[in-house]
Regions:
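Gly/Pro-biased beta-strand-loop elements
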Residues: 1-77
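Exported/periplasmic cell-wall-interacting domains
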Residues: 48, 53-120
Length: 120
């Protein structure tokens, strides 16, 4: 089955079940699909992504997302699902990544075994 993230609402779901409210993008571009082309400001571009693994670079249990062929990323890259950054105001950590707080929730994504995320 698949994971789904809806940019305009911030809803992350798995097989139709609400998992978390998230955000993507920064400032005036946050959660606005029509800003997906703006580097370091717009939300993650709509398309299909492979859940490729995890790392602890941006936050514990950050999920690595790789676009699948046919997904237009507008030359943008290094998308992840990670948490807000410590020492910064909440809601300001995204330069295009999906921000979902709660390491346990991110671990659930990875542990699910489902490796497809559809961004709408």
């Amino acid at each position: 089955m698949t994971w789904e993230y809806k940019v305009s609402t911030g809803i992350l779901s798995h097989n139709g079940k609400l998992i978390a409210y998230c955000y993507s993008g920064a400032g005036e571009s946050k959660d606005k699909p029509n800003c997906e082309h703006i580097r370091n400001k717009g939300p993650i571009p709509r398309g299909v992504y492979f859940i490729a693994g995890w790392n602890n670079h941006k936050s514990p249990a950050a999920i690595i997302l790789e676009p699948i062929a046919g997904t237009n990323t507008f030359g943008r890259d290094h998308f992840e699902i990670h948490g807000d950054k410590k020492g910064q105001p909440p809601g300001t950590a995204s330069a295009g990544c999906i921000i979902m707080n709660g390491q346990d929730k991110r671990q659930t994504i990875y542990d699910s075994g489902d490796t497809i995320l559809v961004v709408r």
